[in-house]
Amino acid sequence: PERNTIELLPTSIAGRKVRFIVLDDATDTTAAVRNARKLVTEDRVDVIIGPTVTPTSLALLEVIGPAETPMISLAGSSVIAHPVEGHKRWAFKLAPNEPLMAARIFEHATNNNVKTIAYIAFANAFGESFTSEMRKVGELRKVQTVAHEKFNPTDTSVTPQVLKVLSLNPDAVLI
């Protein structure tokens, strides 16, 4: 989806021509770092838009920081850009931070009498930080966590996790 978005972006900004270079890292941190190095050293880009997942965004910090090249990550985890120090001074993200997302989710859940919740989340940095924040807010809102199942982003099926969660009959399931 992100690649398709590039076609919608303007070809000029303030009268200056803009050139977009699209490289696919396939959510692989090694490929992401290799692509970022190419963009910074060979293409001499002004900014990197992406990556789209937390692990690859975190990996790029070691490239963008020393190069002083801003990165606008499309991933969700707050750890990409916070605290604003070191290489993270060059990292920005568009998605809201986990506390804001959790607050809104639980506001809706408690308004709809949700008392129990289960999570099925990525087994990566974003999945961990997101479910950690969800548990904190859930406890404050008196919503009991009945399951926290994980899966790898490359998994082709989450059937075992779904079946386990559904067997516990939670009021809500967050994936």
Residue ranges and their predicted role:
Residues 8, 34, 38, 59-62, ...:
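Alpha-helical scaffolding segments of alpha/beta enzyme cores, especially the outer helices
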Residues 49, 172-175:
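Structural motif
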Residues 26, 94-97, 150-153, 175:
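Short, flexible loop segments at the rims of nucleotide/cofactor-binding pockets, characterized by
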Residues 19, 115-116, 171-172:
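Residues that mark the start of a beta-strand
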Residues 28, 55-56, 151-158:
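Short acidic loop-to-helix transition motifs that present clustered carboxylates
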Residues 22, 29-46, 107-111, 156-169:
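Short, well-structured alpha-helical segments in soluble
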Residues 4, 44-149:
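Extracytoplasmic ligand/sensor domains, especially the bilobed periplasmic-binding protein
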